[in-house]
Regions:
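Conserved beta-strand-loop-alpha-helix hinge in the C-terminal portion
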Residues: 233-251, 459-480
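Conserved ABC transporter NBD signature motif
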Residues: 74-85, 319-329
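H-loop/switch region of ABC-family ATPase nucleotide-binding domains
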Residues: 213-214, 439-440
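ABC-family nucleotide-binding domains
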Residues: 187, 414
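Conserved ABC ATPase signature
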Residues: 152-156, 160, 379-383, 387
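Catalytic Walker B motif of ABC-type/P-loop ATPase nucleotide-binding domains
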Residues: 177-180, 404-407
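Conserved ABC ATPase "signature" region
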Residues: 131-148, 358-375
Length: 481
């Protein structure tokens, strides 16, 4: 058997990089297995796509191939990396065989500087100092990270943070790289740049790549094979058969609301460090009661910061912020785990019932709406990222907030789940809620927004109706939707 960190000798047939054999897995509290005798074979050197509906088991399958993050539960079958059972790997062998990149770099980056993050995993593996410096230098040069090598990780854009997560993983030189929705939080330009780097790692370094994604079309030009996960099984599909995203049906048209402001921001200046760059630079925002406003712009433009400012979570160093609906607001941050704090899915939806005037019937209906009735007794962290996103949003919606602040609410969701979010925002709008959302999903913006504000250089450079925005925009026109 070839050791996990070594290539087979010349003339020998290459083993599959990843082989899943009759894998069955059931989460604690689950009624049915998420994976049921699932099998697949990914050839060495492939760029493979793993597709399927939200909650189909894509993330579970990937995590079971990386023992350090494998979920707890009942398991049968085998997962092999280069012919070896992944559960037999020692830590150094696991790092040399299988690397893993999460959907959110915030779940992966643990150090305060780029250079320390690059060295962190190598230090834990006991790599000698000279070899560590060589690996860090080579990897940073490969990914063009020199200009921001000594930057604070908190100052990086979303694209840079995801590139750092990828580079720090590859510095450990795995032969197989698993990625779970790695571009779902990136703007279109950052997504293209990241996929280009990933493709280079595959082609130039010979690393086998397996990507779980709801947007296979963006990666089809790089892929060599694709698999669909559904009903517990895995089947290979033709790249030409990968479904294009369905258009999102827009909410019923209405005139953009006018009247009093729900949130009024005047001349706001905000930065996170005394000597850091200003994230918001004299920004003005007037959010009208009852409107749905979308914030768009590149990674690092300040969308999340503006949501935090409106919610009172962040404080401006200069300027004024008035929130007339502060007592009735709900914030969905980029990480849904910030909202999820209970032991079971059902408990999440009942946590705020007493103070919000709903009961068991509404909770049961919400579980059914989310397709989580059979998962009601599972731990929320055992759900897929998309299911966690929907659960967190549903938890907020049950409280009927007057102001709903949403940060990337459709990230990592399939078409059906995105449609659910459109309807959820529409129901909140029709109930009189004011909605401020930040997103890279332009089809979602077109479906739900009354007005669109573009952030650039710390300011809102334009605010117009959604129809006006898409008619006038070159970058965000129909080509991006």
């Amino acid at each position: 058997m070839t050791p996990p960190g070594k290539k087979p000798a010349r003339g020998c047939a290459a083993m599959p990089a990843l082989e899943v054999c009759d894998l069955t897995f059931t989460y604690p509290g689950g009624v049915a297995p998420v994976l049921d005798r699932a099998s697949l074979v990914v050839p060495d050197g492939a760029f493979a796509l793993l597709t399927g509906p939200t909650g189909s088991g894509k993330s579970t399958l990937l995590r079971l191939a990386k023992p350090e993050i494998a979920p707890a539960g009942e398991r049968a079958g085998e997962v092999l990396a280069f012919g070896a059972d992944v559960r037999s790997f020692l830590p150094a062998e696991s790092a040399a065989a299988v690397g893993y990149v999460f959907q959110s770099p915030d779940n992966q980056i643990v150090c305060d500087t780029v250079w320390h993050e690059m060295a962190f995993g190598l230090e834990n593996l006991g790599v000698p100092a000279d070899e560590m410096r060589r690996r860090v230098a080579e990897t940073c040069n490969f990914f063009g990270m020199g200009p921001w090598f000594r930057a604070q990780t908190s100052e990086l854009s979303g694209g840079q943070r995801q590139t750092l997560a990828l580079a720090a993983t590859l510095a450990m030189r795995p032969r197989l790289l698993l990625l779970d929705e790695p571009t779902s939080m990136l703007d279109p330009i950052a997504e293209k740049a990241f996929l280009g780097l990933l493709f280079r790692a595959n082609r130039e370094l010979g690393i086998t790549v397996v990507v779980a994604t709801h947007a296979p079309q963006a990666m089809a030009e790089y892929a060599t094979c694709a698999f669909a996960v559904g009903e517990g099984r895995v089947r290979e599909v033709e790249l030409s058969a990968l479904a294009k995203p369905r258009p999102l049906a827009a909410l019923p048209a209405r005139p953009a609301p006018a009247g009093a402001a729900a949130v009024d921001v005047r001349e706001a200046w905000l930065r996170y460090d005394r000597d850091g760059d200003w994230v918001l630079r004299g920004l003005d925002l007037r959010l009208i009661r009852g409107e749905v406003r979308a914030l768009v712009g590149g990674n690092g433009s300040g969308k999340s910061t503006l949501l935090s400012l409106a919610a009172g979570v962040a404080r401006a160093q200069k300027g004024r912020v008035k929130n007339a609906l502060a007592r009735s607001q709900a914030l969905l941050p980029q990480s849904p785990k910030a909202v999820l704090a209970c032991e079971t899915v059902r408990d999440e939806l009942t946590e705020w019932a007493a103070g919000s005037g709903y009961g068991a019937a509404e909770v049961d209906a919400a579980l059914g709406e989310l397709g989580l009735t059979d998962a009601a007794d599972r731990h929320p962290y055992d759900l897929s990222g998309g299911q966690q996103q929907m659960l967190a949003l549903q938890k907020l919606l049950l409280c009927k907030p007057g102001l709903l602040l949403l940060d990337e609410p459709t990230k990592g969701l399939d078409d059906a789940a995105r449609v659910w979010v459109v309807h959820a925002v529409g129901a909140a709008r029709d109930a009189g809620a004011t909605v401020l959302l930040a997103t890279h999903d332009m089809a979602f913006v077109e479906a739900v927004a009354d007005r669109v504000s573009l952030l650039f250089d710390g300011c809102l450079t334009s605010t117009e109706t959604a129809a006006e925005f898409f008619a006038a925009s070159w970058l965000y026109g129909r080509g991006s939707r």
